[in-house]
């Protein structure tokens, strides 16, 4: 695949007409203020968070590449609810998942995961990809639900032309292999090919105890049909 990433800032959703995606799309103010704030309230006032977003390493110390807070809603082809998640707490996120499919004109054929990430200062996200190289028809979404974020707090999403394992050498990897940077901004939605290596910066010390929150929605394969089974581009 071509890793010369091109960013395109769009003003409204569009029906996808061709796969794999050729660009990384950024859509600001995706949800109404009411829905944006409702989602943030729902995820910050629940006790389902755990230190479960971990990328393991082969280090003899047993230490992971990265480990930060997360929560899973549902995963897999049948979108099975995570074992420690109450069904009623998934309703809003199932609405969000349907909205993405309606707004962008597709259906999940091999759904992978819907969950949350939370990073405070020091919890850098190391480089990873969301799916396997052969999954041409994959799709990844990131949505940023924080109500407020100061630009000086950092938290950029970085995309690369090459994978890199672990936190050691990350600064050099950014210098030599970064191909795109997307700033963290409340109510921002990103749509991209999940095979692109990427990772999110931790908030800077100026953020104090503020955390960088994101909704993660991704699948290994989509079809360009609406939820009613019609061709999305007709």
Pin down the residues of each PLM region.
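Catalytic core of non-heme Fe(II) oxygenases with the double-stranded beta-helix
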Residues: 90-234
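Non-heme Fe(II)/2-oxoglutarate
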Residues: 2-107
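Non-catalytic N-terminal targeting/anchoring module and adjacent flexible stem/linker
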Residues: 1-2, 234
């Amino acid at each position: 695949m071509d890793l010369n990433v091109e960013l395109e800032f769009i003003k409204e959703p569009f029906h996808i007409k061709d796969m794999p995606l050729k660009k990384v799309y950024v859509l600001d103010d995706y949800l109404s203020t009411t829905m944006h704030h409702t989602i943030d309230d729902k995820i910050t006032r629940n006790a389902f968070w755990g230190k479960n977003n971990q990328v393991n390493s082969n280090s003899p110390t047993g230490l992971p590449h990265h480990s930060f807070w997360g929560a899973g809603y549902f995963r897999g082809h049948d979108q099975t609810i995570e074992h420690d998640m109450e069904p009623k707490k998934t309703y809003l996120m199932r609405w969000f998942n349907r909205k993405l499919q309606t707004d962008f004109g597709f259906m999940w054929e091999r759904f992978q995961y819907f969950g949350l990430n939370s990073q405070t200062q020091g919890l850098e996200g190391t480089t990873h990809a969301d799916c396997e190289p052969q999954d041409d028809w994959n799709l990844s979404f990131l949505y940023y639900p924080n109500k407020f974020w100061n630009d000086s707090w950092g938290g950029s999403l970085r995309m690369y032309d090459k994978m890199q394992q672990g936190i050691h050498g990350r600064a050099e990897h950014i210098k030599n292999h970064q191909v795109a940077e997307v700033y963290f901004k409340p109510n921002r939605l990103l749509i991209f090919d999940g095979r692109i290596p990427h990772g999110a910066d931790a908030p800077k010390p100026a953020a104090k105890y503020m955390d960088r929150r994101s909704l993660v929605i991704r699948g290994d394969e989509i079809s360009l049909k609406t939820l009613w089974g019609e061709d999305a581009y007709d």
